[in-house]
């Protein structure tokens, strides 16, 4: 015989069902809340998503700590240029404009949990030891030390650096290291500029030959040409403004001539084709080396020098660029 449920049993079942439904809804609400918090944390701190950008005030504090103003570059990079306007360096009778080959710089980029700094410091031989000691004491790594040009007088060296940590502490450490040099740290707008040489070459002529956009900086025509692939180091993308773009500089030296220098950023398979092309076009290779320690793909930096008719040199440089996986115009 089929049993009949009492009102108490029916009410009990209804209450249990209602309680179960409420529990499920509460659990779902909790999971949704946790999911939203996790997504927000990913946005704030990284994990492949967009991270919070430093405020202008944060970068201003970095600039003040170093003692020199800087500017934002593509890729959320804050870069400070430190030209060695205190040095008078000649190469085979050509006095170098500091912008051509004597430009120290440091560049900062915020990562999810810290700030990265990379840089290139132009140093006299006497400055190398004290600067290296100061950086090592502060936890900033030296990743390379070498020449960029040949036959220069007085001798100059180039120290490449890399560090990770809190941005202001990195800036303070760099200021201490720079205090062992005579690098000018003038207030913005008061840097000493060299007198420009008379010239019959113009920027747009070089742009046409190189098929790239350049800029004029204190009498030097500059081109920065990024590589097409991403450059990574320690799971962080290295922006071109942090020293991984091919740099080509022209210093007019009268009439239609220019002194050129810079560096090609290359993978291993490109090294010898570019050497061959440069030499075929009267451009000397002055150095080949690395600037970093853990980058991917592995990069080689090839420095060059020539003093000749500017458009002729530009044509040779264009042929060399065509041997590389560089971003097109």
Residue ranges of model-derived segments:
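Bacterial N-terminal signal peptides
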Residues: 20-37
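Long, contiguous binding/interaction regions
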Residues: 42-155, 162-299, 303-329
């Amino acid at each position: 015989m089929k049993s009949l449920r009492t009102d108490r049993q029916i009410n009990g079942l209804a209450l249990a069902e209602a309680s179960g439904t409420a529990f499920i809804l509460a659990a779902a609400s909790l999971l949704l809340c946790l999911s939203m918090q996790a997504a927000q944390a990913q946005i704030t701190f990284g994990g492949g998503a967009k991270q919070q950008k430093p405020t202008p005030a944060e970068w201003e504090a970095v600039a003040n700590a170093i003692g020199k103003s800087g500017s934002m570059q593509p890729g959320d990079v804050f870069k400070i240029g430190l030209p060695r306007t205190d040095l008078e360096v000649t190469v085979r009778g050509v006095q170098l404009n500091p912008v051509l080959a004597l430009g120290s710089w440091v560049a900062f980029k915020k990562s999810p949990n810290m700030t990265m700094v990379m840089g290139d410091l132009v140093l006299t031989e006497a400055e190398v030891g004290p600067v290296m000691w100061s950086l090592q004491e502060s936890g900033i790594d030296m990743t390379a030390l070498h020449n960029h040009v040949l036959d220069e007088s007085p001798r100059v060296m180039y120290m490449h650096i890399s560090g990770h940590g809190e941005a202001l502490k990195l800036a303070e450490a760099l200021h201490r290291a720079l205090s062992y040099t005579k690098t000018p740290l003038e207030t913005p707008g008061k840097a000493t500029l060299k007198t420009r040489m008379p010239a019959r070459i113009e920027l747009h002529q070089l742009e046409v030959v190189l098929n790239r956009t350049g800029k004029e900086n204190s009498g030097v025509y500059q081109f920065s040409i990024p590589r097409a692939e991403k450059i990574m180091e320690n799971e962080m993308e290295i922006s071109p403004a942090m020293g991984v773009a091919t740099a080509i500089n022209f210093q007019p030296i009268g009439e239609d001539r220019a002194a050129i220098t810079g560096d090609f950023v290359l993978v291993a398979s490109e090294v010898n084709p570019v050497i061959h092309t440069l030499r075929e076009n009267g451009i000397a290779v002055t150095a080949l080396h690395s600037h970093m320690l853990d980058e991917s793909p592995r990069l080689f930096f090839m420095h060059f020098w020539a003093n000749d008719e500017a458009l002729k040199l530009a044509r040779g440089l264009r042929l060399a660029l065509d041997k590389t996986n560089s971003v097109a115009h």
